[in-house]
Amino acid sequence: MFIGIAGIIGAGKTTLAQQLADYLGYESFNEPVDDNPYLADFYGDMNRWGAMMQLHLLFRRFEQHQRIVWNKEKGAVQDRTIYEDTIFARMLHEAGFIDKRDYETYVGHFNVMKRFLVYPDVLIYLRVTPEVSMQRIKERGRDAEGGITLDYMEKLHQGYE
């Protein structure tokens, strides 16, 4: 069984994914945040790092997705699925942070990868307001997330809805 947890930043995905994995005896696959070499740079300058950040996350999540698919003996709970990456990329493109050429490159990579993807058996969407999300981001205190704005979260929320 493959369970995906979806939602904007600060929705509670990691917490729920870990709790479900522990309860069900599944493996938890968390969003690759701590070892992301682009995260702090991205929130500091989205125009400069938007495309590279999204490509990096797309490749990392594809790698994670393949590990989930090939390990069918044990169930998996994934904190943010690869499909959600397209929401971020589209939102960044529409906001002008990723230019047309880079966005089309991203979409091309995703379309090639899509042939090798499977949908989660269950997808849980955690809906929170951008204001609640911002409060949670502030409370967890990740330095790299200090540049996140309410406007960014509102656009992201619209992309999910």
Question: Where are these predicted regions, by residue range?
Answer:
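Glycine-rich phosphate-binding loop used to anchor ATP phosphates in small-molecule kinases
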Residues: W49-V118
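Conserved lysine of the Walker
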Residues: K13
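Conserved substrate/cofactor phosphate-moiety recognition/catalytic segment
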Residues: D22-R61
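Pre-Walker A (Motif I) flank of P-loop NTPase domains
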Residues: M1-F2, E73
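P-loop (Walker A) phosphate-binding loop of NTP-binding proteins
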Residues: I8
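A glycine- and Lys/Arg-enriched "phosphate-lid" helix/loop adjacent to the NTP-binding pocket
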Residues: I87-G159
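Hydrophobic anchor at the beta1->P-loop junction of P-loop NTPases
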Residues: I5
